[in-house]
Amino acid sequence: MYYGFDMGGTKIELGVFDAELNKVWQKRVPTPRNNYDDLLAMLIDLVHEADAQVGVQGSVGIGVPGIQTGDEGALFTANLPATMGKPLRIDLSQRLQRDVRISNDANCFVLSEAWDAEFRSYPVVLGLILGTGLGGGLVINGRPVDGRNGIAGEFGHLRLPSDALDIIGVDIPRVKCGCGQFGCIENYISGRGFEWLYEHLYGEALPAVTIIRHYRGGEEKALEFVDRFMDLLAACLGNLLTLFDPHLLVLGGGLSNFDEIYQILPTRLPSRLLPIAKLPRIEKARHGDAGGVRGAALLHLMDN
């Protein structure tokens, strides 16, 4: 059996999967935010409860909203203060007496999609989460790419390409990102960036769902804005597609539910790519909120 944990700032979800990726048991509990020992104890109790439910000792994979840094495996994550700087993987492995694997939750999202029955034949899968920020990951031949520092897939912290300024104006503010840098693309093309950019251009703060509703209703400002936003999205994604040349691009997060993206984006991307480049297949994520636990379980299952 394969246990996948999705650890968030408010909840921890555990999903237990068999070898065919059928979910056979699950449980959700509040996250102990500030006490590391309490968090460890809760995770250990959940693992033992799952063992009792399925009658075997399952393997443990964990997706976290952060980065596992260095060879010692310390976590860097603002959303889980109890784990900041702690070697969670090492501590859990020792206490459970089994191999525990940890990866960024965006990597788990992409891994889950790459192992979907429909998508499994694609060698290179690029995933992007267009949510509050811009997360992502890369899976090659069924395995996630983490990189030396665990930051592969932190695409949101790439800078705006120069041609983006032709689309949204050279006077666009260089927003200071949470990482401390200026001009990171997640501040412009994430779900939050979608709303911020509309407010900057039109002086009116509206939620994304309202902007999209106005767009579908033919409202002039919304039509103009979405046209510019799609060009901006294509300019930013064009760099990623040229860099990784994926067979499949999967989109998740709240903005991925804007279904017109899947019709418009393929018409805007070709001008941002090399003339010989063929577009990847572009799809909405298949597994939604369940992708985190599924991908975490796959951190072990992909070995088989």
From Swiss-Prot:
Source superkingdom: Bacteria
Reaction catalysed by this enzyme: N-acetyl-D-glucosamine + ATP = N-acetyl-D-glucosamine 6-phosphate + ADP + H(+)
Matching InterPro entries: ATPase_NBD, N-acetyl-D-glucosamine_kinase, ROK, ROK_cs
Q: Which Pfam families match?
A: ROK
Which pathway does the record list?
Cell wall biogenesis; peptidoglycan recycling
Carries keyword Repressor?
no
Its GO biological process terms?
Answer: N-acetylglucosamine metabolic process; peptidoglycan turnover
Binding-site residues, ATP: 4-11, 133-140
Give me the residues that bind Zn(2+), please.
H157, C177, C179, C184
Q: Which UniProt keywords apply?
A: ATP-binding, Carbohydrate metabolism, Kinase, Metal-binding, Nucleotide-binding, Transferase, Zinc
What top-tier enzyme class does this entry carry?
A: transferase
Q: Name the EC number(s).
A: 2.7.1.59
Q: Name one GO molecular function term.
A: zinc ion binding
SUPFAM superfamilies cross-referenced by the UniProt entry: Actin-like ATPase domain
Instruction: Write out the function statement from the record.
Output: Catalyzes the phosphorylation of N-acetyl-D-glucosamine (GlcNAc) derived from cell-wall degradation, yielding GlcNAc-6-P.
**Member of which family?**
Belongs to the ROK (NagC/XylR) family. NagK subfamily.
Output this protein's name.
N-acetyl-D-glucosamine kinase
Record lineage: Bacteria, Pseudomonadati, Pseudomonadota, Gammaproteobacteria, Enterobacterales
